[in-house]
């Protein structure tokens, strides 16, 4: 008897396949979607900043050049990080991804030379040392989320070679006057060509500096095999030292000093100098019960929807203007951004050899009021960088998962 009932239900399911071929999720008109999306974004931004209400608009009308440079550098860095994740097909699953990060920029400082040079290899011809003072954020050191070392490679027209390998090291305290270093990463770079920013992940190194100030002896970029020049067959060329022919802005361009206006002109040049960008999670945004465990993982990115007129589930463009749509004047940059949204029917694909689809269809038939069919939801999201004021204090922060880049049926 039970077997006969099951067969009847499955027969009805086959007849109902066409009617179940589209998602049962409600299709909304664009105006309603935008209204809901705007309200969601309003709540997201305030939540990620741990604000109960929008800050009062600042009386400051001019954004300092250094702050604007930090904002632009952060945007560039996030774009690079997203590109690396695309190439590596990696996913970010940390719960700390959700909350906004405070952005701190530390320019290179001129420090005293440490006793860590090779006896026959003076620094300057085989390597460059970069030192930074990050003591101002030590009290929040355990909440470091990400640290990037950025340096601008500039072309060297007089270079004798077209390419050279460089390696980045963390300088360690010497042991019995023997130089010690910790390898961080390496790159093969052109010596000429156009200028380009180089980025290195130095999160572990900076975290160590923040926890133990005495360990902060700086970073060093060195050529791959210092103090040796190799012939094409691999033999060492005696008494000839390979020198670093890669040039860096702010380190090798000494001709910039002493020329022009020392005020605004110098400030404009400074943002091209070597620097660290630190992303910190403020303590008050952590350890909140009930938060984080419900956050979604990131997924792979796709630009398919912007290249094709897809009627089914896809990401749709939606521009949010902070002033017009949210009524906010406290966000200085950007003026708005493409938040996007997911929309479109999800085809209900069911085949005879798909047990999951059969069970899902059976459940949907027996529970007509339930929504067991897949809905079009965000799959991949990107962060947004904003510049805003709290009183007269400018802040640059990264807000995670604010831009919908792709969708999926789930």
Curated annotation (Swiss-Prot):
A GO biological-process term: positive regulation of SMAD protein signal transduction
Residues bearing the modification N5-methylglutamine: 291
Tissues with expression: Expressed in mammary glands with a slight increase in expression prior to lactation and again increasing at the onset of involution, expression peaks at day 3 of involution.
Matching Pfam families: TGF_beta, TGFb_propeptide
Secreted found in the keyword field: yes
Signal sequence interval, chain numbering: 1-23
The entry's keywords: Cleavage on pair of basic residues, Disulfide bond, Extracellular matrix, Glycoprotein, Growth factor, Methylation, Mitogen, Secreted, Signal
InterPro entries: Cystine-knot_cytokine, TGF-b_C, TGF-b_propeptide, TGF-beta, TGF-beta-rel, TGFB3, TGFb_CS
Effects seen without this gene: Mice display a cleft palate caused by defects in medial edge epithelial seam degeneration and palate fusion, leading to death within the first day after birth.
CDD domains: TGF_beta_TGFB3
Function description: Transforming growth factor beta-3 proprotein: Precursor of the Latency-associated peptide (LAP) and Transforming growth factor beta-3 (TGF-beta-3) chains, which constitute the regulatory and active subunit of TGF-beta-3, respectively.
Subunit structure: Interacts with ASPN. Latency-associated peptide: Homodimer; disulfide-linked. Latency-associated peptide: Interacts with Transforming growth factor beta-3 (TGF-beta-3) chain; interaction is non-covalent and maintains (TGF-beta-3) in a latent state. Latency-associated peptide: Interacts with LRRC32/GARP; leading to regulate activation of TGF-beta-3 and promote epithelial fusion during palate development. Latency-associated peptide: Interacts (via cell attachment site) with integrins, leading to release of the active TGF-beta-3. Transforming growth factor beta-3: Homodimer; disulfide-linked.
The record's account of how the chain is modified after translation: Transforming growth factor beta-3 proprotein: The precursor proprotein is cleaved in the Golgi apparatus to form Transforming growth factor beta-3 (TGF-beta-3) and Latency-associated peptide (LAP) chains, which remain non-covalently linked, rendering TGF-beta-3 inactive. Methylated at Gln-291 by N6AMT1.
Keyword Disulfide bond in record: yes
Protein name: Transforming growth factor beta-3 proprotein
A Gene Ontology molecular function term of the record: transforming growth factor beta binding
Family as reported in the entry's similarity comment: Belongs to the TGF-beta family.
Lineage top rank: taxon: Eukaryota
Span(s) of short sequence motif Cell attachment site: 259-261
Entry's Gene Ontology cellular component terms: extracellular matrix; extracellular space
Disulphide bridges: 305-314, 313-376, 342-407, 346-409
Taxonomy of the source species: Eukaryota, Metazoa, Chordata, Craniata, Vertebrata
Gene behind this protein: Tgfb3
Glycan-carrying positions: 72, 133, 140
